[in-house]
Amino acid sequence: MSSLDAYFRDVTHHEFVLDTALRTQKLDDVDKDTCNCPIPELLELAPLIIAQKDFSYAYLSNTLVLTLQDAEYYPQGSSNPTHLCLLFNATDRNGSTTVLRNPKRQTRRKIEPDHKDGEGYEFSSHILISLSGQKRTYKAVISRAPKISTNLIELFFNKILFQISRANTEKFSINAKTNATDTSTGKTKKVLYKPVAELRGTLDIELFNKMNSGGLSEVT
């Protein structure tokens, strides 16, 4: 993409920490206190995430649209994949004028954006998440891109997880502990929940070791 450096991409290291949260709003305090929603593993969620390809959601007053452009296991075609690879695309409908300069001729030329029917400049970010985690925590690396902040990645990933819970209500529901009956169905009331994820930054182990063993030992 023309607005990015053609020779390198910044990559940051992170952790995805999985948990669950209630979707059902009207619950007795007893059910809220005793509800124990099982936390799915990423390996279990991976095929459901892949099924959400092409899902989009708008942010920043509808000026930035994030899309799950692609989602695949890595290595591709492996019977025992080790990672989940996601491609997030961002369409920026609020792009500014681009200036092209010719140093030889000492001229500048403006390229005015002409957005039609929701068009915008597009950026992309790859996310590689390990499928083997410990204590609900999964290592990940993210290729950085303009407009796609860590906070937006976390928000969009959780929006995808929410869509998964809506599309798979039987999988993400448990019986209420009080065994209350739903008056509309006559069946035991179900408590709906959703998987959620927190995106955390991680310590650079190489830098940490240098800080403790060499010339950076006084840095805190």
Segments and roles (model prediction):
Residues 99-108, 130-134:
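Acidic/polar residues at beta-strand termini and the immediately following turn/coil
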Residues 118-143:
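Elongated alpha-helical scaffolds
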